[in-house]
C-alpha cells in the first residue's frame, strides 16, 4: 500500500542529518590537509568548495526539520492545492518533537464514498476543517497541525516530566461487501492528565449513495427491542445477570429500563452490528468501552427495509 507522507519532524532525524553533514565536513577538511601535503592546488580549491557545500547542507537540514509542521501545498493565490490521492493509499501526518507527538493515518476511500467518509473523519477529529472535504491530505494535515499546536500550548504551561503529550488517530477500512463499506477509527490522546483517553469509532456507508448508517436504521417499532438487546450486551460485557447488578456498573443511568443508546451508531462488520459506548459515556474510565457485536439475525427484526437490504450478501 502506498503511503503519502506529509511531514515527519524528529530530533533523532535532525541529529542524523546534522551528523551526516558534519562527517562530510570532516572528510573535506582531511582532503584539504592531504592536498596541502602533496601541494595539489586544484584539490585544495575543490575541497574548500566541498566544505562550503557541506555547511550549506547542514544548515538547510536544520532549518527544514526545525520547521516541523506540514502545511498543504498552495497555489499562487494562496489557496490550498488538492492532494492527488488513490483509493487504498494512506495519508500520513507525523510530528515528533521533544515534548509532543502527533500522528494521524487515514486510508483513502473509493471515490463514490470519499466525501461521506471524509466528512465523518472531520467530525470525529474535531469538526473544524473548512476546506475541501474530499481532500484527505488537507484534512489529515489540518488536524495534525492543530493537535501539535494544542499539545505545545499545554506543554508551555508546564507538565510533569513523566507526561507524554501525544495525539494518535488511525482510520482503516474494516469491512466491505458489494453494498456497503465500513471504516474504523481509533483515537488515543494524552494531554498530561491522570490517564490517556481513547475512542473506538466506526461508520458504515452505502456504496450506492454514500449515506452513513445512523440510529434511524432502527424502525419506530423496533426501538424498545434494540434497547433490550443493548442491555443484554451490557450484562454480558460486565458479566452480570440481573438489572440490579448491571446498575452498579453504570453511571448517570436512573434505571435499567432507561439506558440510553450509544452516541456512536452501530456499524457493520463480518459478524454483525457493533454496539459500543465510549469512555465515560455510561460507566467509569476503568470499565473501558462497554459493548459487543450483535449478530445480524438478532438485529434484523428491528431494522428498516432499506438497511435490511444492505445486510444481504
Place the predicted regions along the sequence by residue.
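Alpha-helical membrane-anchoring segments
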Residues: 1, 12-19, 41-52
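Membrane-embedded alpha-helical segments of integral membrane proteins
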Residues: 2-30
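Compositionally biased intrinsically disordered regions enriched in Thr/Gly
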Residues: 4, 62-313
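N-terminal regions of proteins, emphasizing targeting and processing segments when present
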Residues: 7, 17, 36-37, 48, ...
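Transmembrane helix-loop junctions in multipass membrane proteins, especially transporters and channels
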Residues: 7-10, 36-43, 66-69
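Membrane-cytosol interface at the C-terminal ends of transmembrane alpha helices
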Residues: 23-46
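Internal/C-terminal transmembrane anchor helices
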Residues: 43-68
Amino acid at each position: 500500500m502506498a503511503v503519502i507522507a506529509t511531514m515527519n519532524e524528529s530530533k533523532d532525524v535532525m541529529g542524523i542529518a546534522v551528523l551526516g553533514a558534519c562527517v562530510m565536513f570532516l572528510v573535506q577538511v582531511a582532503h584539504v590537509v592531504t592536498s596541502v601535503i602533496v601541494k595539489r592546488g586544484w584539490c585544495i580549491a575543490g575541497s574548500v568548495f566541498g566544505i562550503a557545500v557541506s555547511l550549506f547542507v547542514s544548515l538547510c537540514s536544520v532549518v527544514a526539520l526545525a520547521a516541523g509542521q506540514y502545511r498543504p501545498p498552495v497555489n499562487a493565490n494562496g489557496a490550498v492545492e488538492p492532494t492527488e490521492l488513490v483509493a487504498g493509499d494512506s495519508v500520513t501526518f507525523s510530528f515528533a518533537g521533544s515534548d509532543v507527538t502527533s500522528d494521524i493515518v487515514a486510508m483513502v476511500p473509493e471515490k463514490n464514498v470519499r466525501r461521506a467518509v471524509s466528512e465523518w473523519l472531520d467530525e470525529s477529529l474535531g469538526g473544524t476543517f473548512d476546506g475541501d472535504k474530499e481532500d484527505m491530505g488537507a484534512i489529515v494535515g489540518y488536524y495534525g497541525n492543530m493537535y501539535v499546536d494544542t499539545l505545545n500550548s499545554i506543554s508551555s504551561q508546564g507538565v510533569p516530566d513523566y507526561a507524554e503529550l501525544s495525539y494518535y488517530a488511525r482510520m482503516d477500512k474494516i469491512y466491505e461487501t458489494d453494498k456497503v463499506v465500513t471504516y474504523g477509527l481509533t483515537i488515543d490522546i494524552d494531554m498530561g492528565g491522570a490517564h490517556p483517553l481513547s475512542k473506538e469509532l466506526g461508520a458504515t456507508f452505502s456504496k450506492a449513495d454514500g449515506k452513513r448508517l445512523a440510529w434511524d436504521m432502527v424502525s419506530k417499532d423496533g426501538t424498545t427491542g434494540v434497547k433490550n438487546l443493548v442491555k443484554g450486551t451490557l450484562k454480558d460485557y460486565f458479566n452480570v445477570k440481573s438489572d440490579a447488578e448491571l446498575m452498579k456498573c453504570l453511571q448517570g443511568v436512573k434505571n435499567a429500563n432507561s439506558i440510553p443508546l450509544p452516541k456512536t451508531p452501530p456499524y457493520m462488520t463480518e459478524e454483525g452490528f457493533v454496539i459500543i459506548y465510549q469512555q465515560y459515556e455510561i460507566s467509569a474510565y476503568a470499565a473501558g468501552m462497554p459493548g459487543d457485536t450483535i449478530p445480524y439475525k438478532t438485529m434484523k427484526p428491528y431494522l428498516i427495509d432499506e438497511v435490511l437490504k444492505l445486510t444481504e450478501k
